[in-house]
Amino acid sequence: MADKNTFENEGKGPITINSNFSGAHDYFTNNVLPDDIRTHLRRIKAPTPYANNRDQVFMLVRAGTGKMVVNGIEYRLKPNTLINLGPFHRYRFIPDVGKMLEIVDSRMNSGTYVYMIANPYLKMEQFYVTSEPPVVYLTGLLADIANDSMNGLLGEMNVRSDDSTSICFCYMMDLLGILTEKMPKAYFRHDSGSGEKK
């Protein structure tokens, strides 16, 4: 049955447990989880024109230096910079003179992003997405995890197995986990009392 989980009870027959979550999972799988997670490697040698972002995007700088302008704010780029852009971010890349930016770009729909941030393992009571994108500079283990996740996403683009979408979702959870680990917790909270921008 679609809404039940069955477990074996040491040879005494199956135990059937009702699970309301399975219905939510089925809805997510059939209606929210995208079939077209897209990941590709970009090599940028010259300033790019502005682009209007429509998706949820994770970007990881692999090589080169320069800057990224998002909604009029400049962010320095160097290897192992991880960025998360949301819809309505307007951005462009400007490599340093004589440098080439190498960036892995992985995109998904916003419904999947909402499902990701609702993950109870994030242990965050509030999660607000501000107009300034989260940008973190990684070293050590977190840099290794981010690069491994992007390598996995690039690899799945070539394989496209039956499990590719679920595997890509797990890699993206790794990237979101890194952002929530590195960004100040206040970034994701909304202080309704002060009205001050932090």
Q: Predicted segments — roles?
A:
Residues 1-5, 48, 135-136, 162, ...:
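Jelly-roll (double-stranded beta-helix
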Residues 67-69, 85, 90-98:
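Short beta-strand His + acidic residue motifs that chelate non-heme Fe in jelly-roll/DSBH
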Residues 2-30, 34-36, 92-155, 177, ...:
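A hydrophobic/aromatic-rich effector-binding and dimerization subdomain
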Residues 144, 157-174:
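All-alpha amphipathic helical-bundle segments outside canonical DNA-binding/catalytic cores
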